[in-house]
Amino acid sequence: MKTAQEFRAGQVANINGAPWVIQKAEFNKSGRNAAVVKMKLKNLLTGAGTETVFKADDKLEPIILDRKEVTYSYFADPLYVFMDSEFNQYEIEKDDLEGVLTFIEDGMTDICEAVFYNDKVISVELPTTIVRQIAYTEPAVRGDTSGKVMKTARLNNGAELQVSAFCEIGDSIEIDTRTGEYKSRVKA
Protein backbone atom coordinates (compact mmCIF):
# COMPACT_ATOMS: atom_id res chain seq x y z
CA MET A 1 0.00 0.00 0.00
CA LYS A 2 1.15 3.51 -0.83
CA THR A 3 -0.06 6.82 0.51
CA ALA A 4 -2.02 9.06 -1.85
CA GLN A 5 0.80 11.61 -1.95
CA GLU A 6 3.20 8.97 -3.35
CA PHE A 7 1.12 8.46 -6.51
CA ARG A 8 2.03 10.32 -9.70
CA ALA A 9 0.29 10.85 -13.05
CA GLY A 10 0.29 7.69 -15.18
CA GLN A 11 0.23 5.27 -12.26
CA VAL A 12 -2.72 2.95 -11.61
CA ALA A 13 -4.46 2.41 -8.25
CA ASN A 14 -7.16 0.04 -7.03
CA ILE A 15 -9.96 2.29 -5.80
CA ASN A 16 -13.22 0.63 -4.68
CA GLY A 17 -12.21 -2.61 -6.42
CA ALA A 18 -11.58 -1.09 -9.86
CA PRO A 19 -8.39 0.02 -11.63
CA TRP A 20 -8.13 3.80 -11.98
CA VAL A 21 -5.32 5.54 -13.85
CA ILE A 22 -4.19 8.81 -12.30
CA GLN A 23 -4.18 11.47 -14.99
CA LYS A 24 -3.26 14.33 -12.69
CA ALA A 25 -2.24 14.55 -9.02
CA GLU A 26 -1.87 17.84 -7.13
CA PHE A 27 -0.55 17.97 -3.57
CA ASN A 28 -1.96 20.81 -1.44
CA LYS A 29 -0.98 21.74 2.11
CA SER A 30 -2.74 24.74 3.59
CA GLY A 31 -1.95 26.33 6.95
CA ARG A 32 -4.56 24.82 9.26
CA ASN A 33 -5.97 21.93 7.29
CA ALA A 34 -4.45 18.53 6.69
CA ALA A 35 -2.50 17.95 3.49
CA VAL A 36 -4.64 16.67 0.62
CA VAL A 37 -4.06 15.28 -2.86
CA LYS A 38 -6.52 16.25 -5.58
CA MET A 39 -6.59 13.59 -8.31
CA LYS A 40 -8.10 13.42 -11.77
CA LEU A 41 -8.87 9.74 -12.40
CA LYS A 42 -10.03 7.55 -15.28
CA ASN A 43 -11.58 4.12 -14.76
CA LEU A 44 -9.77 1.63 -17.00
CA LEU A 45 -12.78 -0.70 -17.21
CA THR A 46 -15.55 1.80 -17.99
CA GLY A 47 -13.64 4.81 -19.30
CA ALA A 48 -15.47 7.06 -16.83
CA GLY A 49 -13.54 10.00 -15.46
CA THR A 50 -13.79 11.77 -12.13
CA GLU A 51 -11.96 14.12 -9.82
CA THR A 52 -11.58 13.27 -6.15
CA VAL A 53 -9.68 14.47 -3.10
CA PHE A 54 -7.72 12.15 -0.79
CA LYS A 55 -6.01 12.94 2.48
CA ALA A 56 -2.26 12.81 1.85
CA ASP A 57 -1.88 9.81 4.17
CA ASP A 58 -4.83 7.78 2.76
CA LYS A 59 -3.66 4.32 1.72
CA LEU A 60 -4.23 3.18 -1.87
CA GLU A 61 -3.26 -0.10 -3.47
CA PRO A 62 -1.00 0.30 -6.52
CA ILE A 63 -1.72 -1.89 -9.55
CA ILE A 64 0.90 -2.94 -12.04
CA LEU A 65 -0.75 -3.76 -15.34
CA ASP A 66 0.62 -6.40 -17.68
CA ARG A 67 1.51 -5.29 -21.19
CA LYS A 68 2.21 -7.28 -24.32
CA GLU A 69 3.21 -6.28 -27.84
CA VAL A 70 0.49 -7.08 -30.38
CA THR A 71 -0.45 -6.25 -33.96
CA TYR A 72 -3.92 -5.63 -35.39
CA SER A 73 -5.26 -8.69 -37.18
CA TYR A 74 -8.90 -8.20 -38.23
CA PHE A 75 -12.36 -6.89 -37.31
CA ALA A 76 -15.18 -9.32 -36.42
CA ASP A 77 -18.11 -7.04 -35.55
CA PRO A 78 -18.16 -5.85 -32.72
CA LEU A 79 -14.71 -7.20 -31.80
CA TYR A 80 -11.27 -6.14 -32.96
CA VAL A 81 -8.75 -8.98 -32.94
CA PHE A 82 -5.07 -8.46 -32.14
CA MET A 83 -2.31 -11.08 -32.24
CA ASP A 84 0.97 -11.38 -30.37
CA SER A 85 4.26 -12.85 -31.64
CA GLU A 86 3.24 -16.32 -30.40
CA PHE A 87 0.02 -16.19 -32.47
CA ASN A 88 -2.26 -15.81 -29.42
CA GLN A 89 -5.36 -13.82 -30.36
CA TYR A 90 -6.90 -11.15 -28.13
CA GLU A 91 -10.39 -9.81 -28.77
CA ILE A 92 -11.36 -6.35 -27.61
CA GLU A 93 -14.68 -4.57 -28.01
CA LYS A 94 -15.06 -1.43 -30.08
CA ASP A 95 -16.03 0.59 -26.98
CA ASP A 96 -12.72 -0.26 -25.27
CA LEU A 97 -10.70 1.19 -28.17
CA GLU A 98 -11.74 4.81 -27.64
CA GLY A 99 -9.20 7.12 -29.27
CA VAL A 100 -7.43 4.26 -31.04
CA LEU A 101 -10.09 3.39 -33.64
CA THR A 102 -9.27 6.46 -35.71
CA PHE A 103 -5.90 4.99 -36.64
CA ILE A 104 -6.70 1.28 -37.01
CA GLU A 105 -6.82 0.07 -40.59
CA ASP A 106 -6.56 -3.23 -42.44
CA GLY A 107 -3.01 -4.25 -43.23
CA MET A 108 -1.42 -2.03 -40.59
CA THR A 109 1.91 -3.31 -39.29
CA ASP A 110 2.35 -0.99 -36.30
CA ILE A 111 3.32 -2.70 -33.06
CA CYS A 112 0.72 -1.86 -30.41
CA GLU A 113 0.63 -2.64 -26.69
CA ALA A 114 -2.25 -4.61 -25.20
CA VAL A 115 -2.93 -3.66 -21.57
CA PHE A 116 -4.14 -6.50 -19.33
CA TYR A 117 -6.01 -6.42 -16.02
CA ASN A 118 -6.88 -9.78 -14.40
CA ASP A 119 -5.77 -11.60 -17.59
CA LYS A 120 -8.26 -9.63 -19.72
CA VAL A 121 -7.34 -7.05 -22.35
CA ILE A 122 -8.78 -3.72 -21.23
CA SER A 123 -7.21 -1.45 -23.83
CA VAL A 124 -4.74 -1.20 -26.67
CA GLU A 125 -2.17 1.57 -26.97
CA LEU A 126 -0.71 2.65 -30.29
CA PRO A 127 2.88 3.82 -30.75
CA THR A 128 3.25 7.58 -30.20
CA THR A 129 3.70 8.19 -33.93
CA ILE A 130 2.34 6.25 -36.88
CA VAL A 131 2.53 6.64 -40.65
CA ARG A 132 -0.65 6.64 -42.75
CA GLN A 133 -1.43 7.38 -46.39
CA ILE A 134 -3.69 10.18 -47.64
CA ALA A 135 -6.60 8.80 -49.70
CA TYR A 136 -8.15 12.15 -50.61
CA THR A 137 -7.50 15.85 -50.16
CA GLU A 138 -8.36 19.00 -52.07
CA PRO A 139 -5.59 20.56 -54.16
CA ALA A 140 -3.79 23.48 -52.51
CA VAL A 141 -4.98 26.96 -53.44
CA ARG A 142 -2.14 28.83 -55.10
CA GLY A 143 -1.16 32.06 -53.38
CA ASP A 144 -2.76 31.14 -50.05
CA THR A 145 0.56 30.71 -48.26
CA SER A 146 0.68 33.26 -45.46
CA GLY A 147 1.39 31.50 -42.17
CA LYS A 148 0.81 27.82 -41.51
CA VAL A 149 -1.79 26.80 -44.09
CA MET A 150 -3.72 23.60 -43.33
CA LYS A 151 -6.36 21.64 -45.23
CA THR A 152 -8.51 18.58 -44.53
CA ALA A 153 -7.28 15.18 -45.69
CA ARG A 154 -8.99 11.78 -45.55
CA LEU A 155 -6.90 8.72 -44.73
CA ASN A 156 -7.37 5.25 -46.25
CA ASN A 157 -9.49 4.17 -43.25
CA GLY A 158 -11.85 7.18 -43.61
CA ALA A 159 -10.47 9.25 -40.73
CA GLU A 160 -10.03 12.96 -41.41
CA LEU A 161 -7.44 15.38 -40.06
CA GLN A 162 -5.76 18.69 -40.87
CA VAL A 163 -2.52 18.48 -42.90
CA SER A 164 -0.16 21.01 -44.47
CA ALA A 165 -1.28 22.56 -47.75
CA PHE A 166 1.56 20.91 -49.72
CA CYS A 167 0.35 17.35 -48.91
CA GLU A 168 -1.24 15.49 -51.84
CA ILE A 169 -3.20 12.31 -52.49
CA GLY A 170 -0.95 9.27 -52.00
CA ASP A 171 1.49 11.03 -49.65
CA SER A 172 2.46 9.25 -46.45
CA ILE A 173 2.20 11.38 -43.34
CA GLU A 174 3.33 10.98 -39.75
CA ILE A 175 0.62 11.38 -37.08
CA ASP A 176 0.96 11.88 -33.32
CA THR A 177 -1.49 9.33 -31.84
CA ARG A 178 -1.69 11.14 -28.47
CA THR A 179 -3.16 14.29 -30.04
CA GLY A 180 -4.41 12.93 -33.38
CA GLU A 181 -2.56 15.71 -35.18
CA TYR A 182 -0.46 15.72 -38.33
CA LYS A 183 3.29 15.96 -37.62
CA SER A 184 5.05 15.82 -40.99
CA ARG A 185 5.12 14.38 -44.47
CA VAL A 186 7.21 11.22 -44.81
CA LYS A 187 9.76 11.17 -47.60
CA ALA A 188 9.35 8.21 -49.94
Curated annotation (Swiss-Prot):
Involved in peptide bond synthesis. Stimulates efficient translation and peptide-bond synthesis on native or reconstituted 70S ribosomes in vitro. Probably functions indirectly by altering the affinity of the ribosome for aminoacyl-tRNA, thus increasing their reactivity as acceptors for peptidyl transferase. Changing residue 32 to A: Abolished arginine rhamnosylation. InterPro entries: Elong-fact-P_C (IPR015365), NA-bd_OB-fold (IPR012340), Rib_uL2_dom2 (IPR014722), Transl_elong_fac_P/YeiP (IPR020599), Transl_elong_KOW-like (IPR013185), Transl_elong_P/YeiP_cen (IPR001059), Transl_elongation_fac_P (IPR011768), Translation_prot_SH3-like_sf (IPR008991). It is found in: Cytoplasm. Keywords: Cytoplasm, Elongation factor, Glycoprotein, Protein biosynthesis. It comes from the Bacteria. GO terms for cellular component: cytoplasm. NCBIfam families: efp, PRK00529.1. Glycans are attached at residue 32. Transmembrane segments: none annotated. SUPFAM superfamilies: Nucleic acid-binding proteins, Translation proteins SH3-like domain. HAMAP family: EF_P. One of its GO terms (molecular function) is translation elongation factor activity. The keyword Cytoplasm applies. It comes from Pseudomonas aeruginosa (strain ATCC 15692 / DSM 22644 / CIP 104116 / JCM 14847 / LMG 12228 / 1C / PRS 101 / PAO1). Pathway: Protein biosynthesis; polypeptide chain elongation. Belongs to the elongation factor P family. One of its GO terms (biological process) is peptide biosynthetic process. The keyword Protein biosynthesis applies. It holds the Pfam family EFP_N. This is Elongation factor P. Coiled coil: none annotated. Glycosylated ar Arg-32 by EarP: arginine rhamnosylation is required for EF-P function and rescue of polyproline stalled ribosomes. CDD domains: S1_EF-P_repeat_1 (cd04470), S1_EF-P_repeat_2 (cd05794).
